[in-house]
Amino acid sequence: MAHRSVTPRTAGFNTLDMAGLTIPSLFVIMALMFVGASPGGTGGGVKTTTFGVTVLALWATVRGDREPTVFKRRIGLEVVFKAFLISFIAFLALNCAAIVTLMIEGRGLLETLFETTSALSTAGLSMGHSGSVLSLAGQFSPAGKLLVKVMMFVGRVGPLTVAIAFAARRERARLRYPEGRVLIG
């Protein structure tokens, strides 16, 4: 049974007919695919450590702590910011890709979300059609296939790396601005 939770994160072994699963099962699989593999591996997704840091930071915020801690070690704010940035960029890329794929291919929302999430995570899973066709993305138009390839590239290289490659670099100033108070919530 543990294999079923590892497959969406890294393996790419399509051991089940994904089109035959229930909607809640598909959403659990999509969540596992979004998180993806652990760092150092060849799988895509936002990575397990990024997800862990994000959850720990949210928990620390709820508890009123200044910094998240785990195993009697604090996690620096720079790491927390990177984890949130990676998660946000991946979520934004996933939603943009799903919307564009919906417009190009005209498939159902669930199938499109599943295919784009699978591409981002490089999991290799597909809802396909029951029967002889196993890959729904294999039936996409050339534009849809190109979008899947771009998502696979973003998922494998990493959302932050892709964002840094396109962002304008500027020299860091040695001064610090005074802290501003912003009302949240």
Language model feature labels by segment:
Residues 1-185:
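Membrane-proximal intracellular helices of multi-pass ion channels
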